[in-house]
């Protein structure tokens, strides 16, 4: 298996989505000093994304809430989509989640509103190159720390990726053979979206009409 180098890559934010932040494993070990952990809301999907692109330690990825951002790639990078089903696309070609893809200079990464789940993760080989604070790049917007200037991404932001070498197998989004990977195993689709949620009515139930409670259930 050939080893490939990925250097001087970045992406420009064309559209930021509803709320897209840089997250890693979280800022662990500083809560006694009042430092929030931050980190991914869906740790499992984040971790799977890291593994897919060959990152052996937690590094910065994009956490996308409800609506996918649109990103224009500069250089060459490896990317994987995990978590919520936002129908990710590369150059308007829909690609499955849970598979690493190679993106080239000028490629456009995008998607739609989530069809299932709330947060999708876009992981990059090497990770997102932003300053660490207390050993983490996780964004905490209320404290305005971490990530890209301590805030969600906005249009025209240009975000660098760390240089890396990889010897993992990646797919080209244009090849028909990618459909071989579009299975339950590789495209697991996150968690089941139709699981029942059990509710115990409390004292606040009297504040709702019978019709409202019926519609909720």
Where are these regions (language model features)?
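Conserved "landmark" site that anchors the functional core of diverse proteins
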Residues: 1-217
